[in-house]
């Protein structure tokens, strides 16, 4: 896929902020990420799903963080986890997609600040050099159902020590 093709996909994602999941172009993987908080249990969860053009799940991960986070913070950590997983597997052309407008907008901008959230965003951006192509796309909750379900599941698991 050419750079113009990826740009077309990015523009389509920006315009529609889709209500459903759309596959990435050929030779590109889509990495959906999500984060959720559970303040009553003082924990948060992260979910990542990497899919190909056919919608086949190539990799996924879920993590529990045993401390409370603001939503934007856990979403930022989920984005960093997503790119870390993609780097470890060796994907080079990716679309990072999440339902947090604040995180996706911050990733697209090139501003630098010293707030806790902006430092987390910089952590996500630090992975960019690992990819030949990296696009940021926003979806609505309905376009991120699988990843959101993964996060909700991991948050529902009781803490068990073995």
Residue ranges and their predicted role:
Residues 1-162:
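Primary recognition of RNase H-like, Mg2+-dependent phosphodiesterase/nuclease domains
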